[in-house]
Amino acid sequence: MKRFNIAILSLVSLALISAQVKAQQKNFNQLFTAGHANAFIGGLYDGFYPYWQLKQHGNFGLGAPDKLDGELVILEGKIYQTQHTGKTFEVDPKSLTPFAAVNYFHADKAIKLSTEYNKASLMALLDSITANSIGIYAIHLKGKFKHIKTRAFPPVNQKPYTPLAQLLNKQHFFEYKALDGDFVGYNLPAYMEGANITGYHFHFISAERNAGGHVIDFTTEKDMMVEIDFLDSFTVQFPQTNDFKSFDFKKDRSEEVKSVEIGKKE
């Protein structure tokens, strides 16, 4: 009996040590990116990184599905896909993403908005909070939106794929009123340009998890909650594909990125 108790205690100890090691492996201040933003914008839409593995690097984030089939949101450890039809659902963990960014979200600052904000005024408020030019910020908004406009792209099916800025006429827009939900996004510094989407970048998921997309425009209601997580490092997992190895990284795609972010050419 004594040996049995010792064996049980040994198993419990091993389990606790394993849990501690896993906890230590989680970097709560690090942004993880699978893929490369410029490569994705330039037409590398084939998924290479499985969702189940992506969730090992964070419980919060955004990205794109395989073959550009809509938009992704990662929230509370679950990954949701919104297709160009508007259909929104939790993904198959074995499916792949060509580009996604995640982190383990822990709010370092929280603000409850006392009035309505439109896109411009909210960005100005966030500018005052995320003023460090080298800072990496994960941003979560939760509450009711008076109005919100999102978009999603249809899937591509024939290679070579067309660069994303040339597919703006294919995007589908969705507009909602008086809808509860979450913004999931980032404000990333200029030195990350190319590898990721710099500046503000938000995706939306409704409270009912049946609507979403890349955020184009919005107006909040009062009492919106804003949470900001200050990150201090980032890591990137690049695809090991022939398409990636032969991609033209010398081309300046900054204007293409701007057009894709706002959903139109300026």
Regions found by a protein language model. Name each.
Residues 247-266:
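Conserved catalytic alpha/beta cores of large enzymes that bind or transform nucleotide phosphates
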Residues 36-100:
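N-terminal low-complexity or amphipathic/hydrophobic leaders
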Residues 206-250:
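A hydrophobic, small-residue-rich beta->alpha segment in the mid-to-C-terminal subdomain
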Residues 82-129:
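A glycine-rich, hydrophobic loop/mini-helix early in the fold
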Residues 1-24:
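Bacterial Sec-dependent N-terminal signal peptides
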Residues 197-205:
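Histidine-centered divalent-metal-coordination microenvironment in nucleic-acid enzymes
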Residues 123-186, 191-195:
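Long, positively charged binding patches that form subdomain-scale interaction surfaces
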